[in-house]
Amino acid sequence: MDPSLLHSSEEVKPTSNTSSGGSNYPSPNTAGQSHTTDNTSPSTVPQSQSTSQTHNQPPQPSSQSQSQPGQDTSALDDNESAKRPRLRLAHACDRCRRRKIRCDTQHPCTPCQQSNNVCTFETPSRRTVKSKGNSERVSSTGGVKRPHSPGRVFASLATGRGESQSNLEARLAALESMLRDVPPNVHNAFLSTLDARLGSGTGVGLKEGGGGGEGVGVAVEALAGTSLANLNLPGNLGYNMGGSELNAQRRLGQNTLSPDWAATGGLSGWLNDAVLGKKKEEAGMDELAKRLGGMSFFYEDEIGQAKWQGATSGFPLLHLLAAHNAPKEEDEADSADGDVSGEMMASPAADSIPSTSPNTSVILPRRISSSSTPAGRASSVHAKARSSSIGLGAIGRRASSADRRKKERFFPDRTPRPHQTLNPEASWKVITGVIPPDLMDTLVRCYLSTSHLLWPFLHVPSFLTDYANPAQWGEPGFTCFIVAVCTLSSRHVDDPRVRANPADPSTAGKQYFELFKRLRDLPSADRPTLYSIQAAFLAAIYAFGLGNLSKAFSLQAESITLCLDGGLHRSVDAYDHFDAIEKETRKRTFWSIYAWDKQSAALFGRPPIIHLRDCDVTEPLIVDDENLSPEGIKDESINSKSRMCAFVATIRLHVILEGVIDSATQPSAFPTSPFLARAAATIARRTAQNETLRDEEELLEEWKRILPKYWCYDTETANSRDPIRITQAERLHCLEHLVKMIIYRHRFSGFVAMPASTAEERARHLDLCRKAMQCALTIIADHVHISQRGMMTYYGVHVIHQLAQAGRTLVAVILNCRNADFRPIIAPSVEGLRSCVGLLRRFSGRYLCGLRSADIIDEFCRVCNIPVDSPRVPNSAGRPSPAWLRPVRKRVATPPPIADSPGSSGMMNFDPNTLTANSGAHASGVNDNMGISAGGVGNIGGPASDLDALFNTAAYFNVPGGEVSGGMAGTSTGSAPNVGNHNVNIGPSNSFLPTLGGLGEASAPYDRFETLSPNAELGNGNTMLSNYQDSHAGFSLSGDTDHPMGNGLGTSAGAGAGHISFDYGLNGHGFGGESLATKGMDNVSDGLKQGTGGSNLSAATILSLMEEGSFDYGSIFTDQAP
C-alpha cells in the first residue's frame, strides 16, 4: 500500500489525461450521441473547403430540410452566400485562434495533435464580407453565421428584396417545414421570443447558438437552467432532437413511478403549464423573474470540493453578470469546449443537454469505473474530495487543457491546495483494533440487508468497490462512514463482540460510537463529501436509538448543514460536474435526511430544520443500482417493483407530513410588540384555516391513488413470499396512517381548549377521536404482525417513533372520553395501549429509546389512572430506571377543560372491565379497577392533574432524559407484582420503584430470531457478499452456535483485500437479509410459509380484535405475558 497515491490532484492529472484517448480517437460525442445523417466524426472530415464547412457546422433541421422533396434550395440569393464565413484552411484552427498561438493550418494541426485535442475550423473568419441590409444586422448577433438559421430566414422573409411571389412562397414553405420539426414546448415557449430578440440584443440577450451549443443566452441559462433542461431545450434551440443521448436525457427526466407519478412531480409539469399559458414574448422574462429567487452557485473550493451558495450570497448574480459581459473570445472558447459549467458552473441549461455538434466535447461522466484503469484506483482518494463518495477516479474525465483554461479565467497564477488525507495503513489499524475485520464484514453485510433497505442512499456497486480499495481508508469521510455502518448494524446482530459489555445487549455499538466521535475530529472529516454526510446521518439514527437525544439532534443538524454546504438540496442535473451515479446518490442521500428530519420533528414536536421550499432537487429515479452506470440508465423501463419505488413513495409521505407539521403551528401574535406581530404574519404568510389540513389530506389521497399496486398493503401483499415487499408495503401503510393520525389528532385537540357545545360538535369530536384511534390501532396491529412473523429485522428506529406517536394518541383519545357517547372507543384504546407498550418494551432490547417511550406512556397511564397491564421486558434482570421526564410546573395552573356536555362533570371510567361488564364492578375505586369517580379529575391526585400539561407532551422531549450508566434502564411499572395497582410513589428517591430487569440477556426470542433471519423458501438470495478468504465461523448472528455464519466478508491484513461481488438479481424474491440466513434462524421462513395461517394472525385480524377490545398480546408473545 503506497500512501503516495493519496496526494493532491496534480499527481494524477497526467494519468487521467493519458487514459482519455489519443490524438486520432474519434469524438465520443459522435459515437455516443448523434444519430443524424449530418453528424460526422472530426477525424474523418475531408480537407476540401466545402465538405469541411458542411460537416463542421452543427446539424440543424434547416440543413436536413435541404434534401427534402419540394424544397427550393435556390431560394437563398447571392447575398446569403456572401454572408457565409470564408472557411479556408489558410487561417488558424479554432483552438489556436483562442490560444493565440501559431497554427500550421494542417488538418489536424500539429499543436492540436500534440495536445490530444480535436482540431476544428468552425469559427468564421473575421474578414467576413459585410453585406448591407437588414438581414446582416439580424444575423450578425448570432456569433456563428448559419445560412439556414431561423434568424436569417426570418430576416430574409422580412426584407423581401423584391423576390418573386413564387420565391417568397418557397421560403414560407421551408420555414413551415422547419417549425413542424420543432417540439411544441420549445416552439410555443421560446421561438417567438427568439424571433423578437435575436437582432435587438435587448433584455437578457438571447442569441443564436453556435457549434458549442450555447442556445439560449447566459442569463436565462443561469437562472432557468433546470427549467430549460426539463423542456429538453438543447444547445441549438431544439432544432435537432434526434440524438440518442438527448432522447435518453428526456426519458431520464420522465423515469418515475408511472405516468401519474411523473405528472405530479418534477419541474417540467408546472413549467409547461405556466409558460404555455402566457404570451410568447413574455415567457422568457417571466421565467427569468420566477427563477430569480432560486439562483444557485456551485463552485469548487480551494481543494476542488464542489460546494454551493445561494442567491443572497451575491455570487449567482455576480457570476451571471460576469458571464454575460465576458469577452467574446472567452465566451466562444467556453462554448466550443462545452465545459463551462463543469469548471465554473456558468451555464447549466446549455450543459444539461448534450450537444449534437461533432466537434463539441461530449459530456462525459466526471468519474470513470474503478475497474477501468489502474490510474482510476490511484486517483480515488482525491476523487472523493470532488465527487464525494461514489466510485473512483472521479477526475479521469478532466484533461489538462480544461485545467489550463480554468486557470486562464480564474486565479490563473494559483494552484489548488492538496487534499488532506489520512495514512490508510494507520487508519485501517486504528479501526480494526476496535472492529475486527471479519466482524466488520459481517456488519457491512447486515447493514446492506437491513437499514439500507429503509434508506437506500448508497449505490451499492460503487460502495463495495470503495470498500475493497485500500486507498479509500485514507479518506476521513469514508472511514467515518464504515464505523457508522458498523455502529448501526451492531443493534441487529447477536455477536457479543459488538457490545461494550458482552453480557449487556443494550451496550451494542457504544465503543464504535466513541470511535466514530474521535474520527470526526480528524482533519477533513467535516468536509461535505457524500460519505461524511451519510456517516453523520447514520450516527444520528444510532444516537436516537440509544436515547441520547442531544447528540442525536446535533448529528442530524450536522448532516443537514453538510447537505446545504454541498448543495445536495439543489438540482445538479444541469451540471456536468457530477456523473449519473453521483447525481442519484446525492438525491437519495438528501431525501433520506429530509424524511428523517420530518419524522423526528413530528415525534418530538420540533420545527423541521429544512423545508421543501428550500429545495429544488428532484425525486430519485426509479432505477435499481444494477441498472445505473456513470453514463446513465442501462434499462430505462420503469419497474413498479423496484425498491426505489417504495423509497420515493416514502419520500412523498414525508413531504405531506411537513405540511401537517407546519399547519399545526401558527405564527405568534406577539401582543406586546406590534412590529413583531406584523413581521410574524408577513413572514409566515399563512392565513387562518377554518378546515385545517384539508389540503394535506387531499395530497394524502392523491398519494394513495398513484401508489403502484405492487406496494399497496392488501391481501396479495400480505400473502407474498417476498419479505422485502411485505415489510416495505407495511411500512408505507403505517406511515400513511401516521400522517392521518396526526391530522385527526390536530383536529380534535381544538375541542380540548374549546369544548364542543352542540350535539353536532360533539358528534364531530367523537368522529375525529374514533378516526385517530383507528389509525393508531392500525399502526400497532401492523407492527405486531411484522414482529410475530420474525421480520422486524428489516425495520429500525422509525418503528419506535411510530409506536410512540400511536401510544400518545391513544392516551389523548382516552382522556377525551368525558361522556357516554365515547364509551365504545375506550376499551379498544386501552387494548391498543397495552400492545403498544409491549412492542416498545420488546424493541428495547435493540434500541434503548423503546424503553424510554414505553416508560413515558406507562407513566401517563399511571398518572391518569388508565388501567394498562403493561407487558414486561423479555428476560429482564432488574435495574432501576431513571425519571425520563418531569414536566416543569407553571406559576399559574391551567384550569381543567370544561366537560363536553352539561350532563358530564368529569372524565369517564377508563376500566374496560367496568365498561364491558354489566356487573357490580367498582366503578369509583382506584384500588380495584383504577376507575375514576364522577367527581372529575380531582381524584387523580397530585400536581399532575393539569390536563394541558398532559396533552402538551411534545414539549417534554426537549428536557434531557437521564441515561443510566452503561445504557441500562428498566421500567417503572412493567414488572410490578400487581400490575393493576399503580399506586407507586415517584419521588426523589427510587427506593420504592419496582425494579425491572435490565437487558443482561438478549430479549429472546426477539433479539434472536428478529436479527438476521433466513428465508430458505425464497430460493436465490440477492445479496451475495463473498471473498476468497476462509469463512469466519466463530459466531452466529442468531446466537446459535450450532449453525455458525459461513459467508463472512473476511479480509486479510490489507484493507479490503478480499474480492467482493454483489448479485442484484431480484428473481422475484426481493432483496436483503433472507440470503444472510442460517439454519438456526428459520423464523422468517416460518412466517412466510405459515402466512396468516397457523399461530400467526394477519394484521387485519389483529386490528379487528383490538377494535373489539379482545386482543390478547400475551398470547402472541408469551415471553412478555404478565
From Swiss-Prot:
One of its GO terms (biological process) is DNA-templated transcription. Residues 400-416 have a biased composition (Basic and acidic residues). Disruption phenotype: Leads to dysregulated gene expression, decreases resistance to phagocytosis, and increases sensitivity to menadione and antimycin A (superoxide generators). No sensitivity to cumen hydroperoxide or sodium nitrite (reactive oxygen species), sodium dithiocarbamate (inhibitor of superoxide dismutase), rotenone (respiratory chain complex I inhibitor), dimethyl malonate (respiratory chain complex II inhibitor), or oligomycin (respiratory chain complex V inhibitor). Residues 14-39, 353-362 have a biased composition (Polar residues). Gene3D superfamilies: Zn(2)-C6 fungal-type DNA-binding domain. Transcription factor that regulates alternative transcription start site usage when cells switch from growth in exponential phase to stationary phase, and acts on genes involved in translation, glycolysis, glycogen synthesis and mitochondrial proteins. This is Transcription factor TUR1. The lineage of its organism: Eukaryota, Fungi, Dikarya, Basidiomycota, Agaricomycotina. The gene is TUR1.
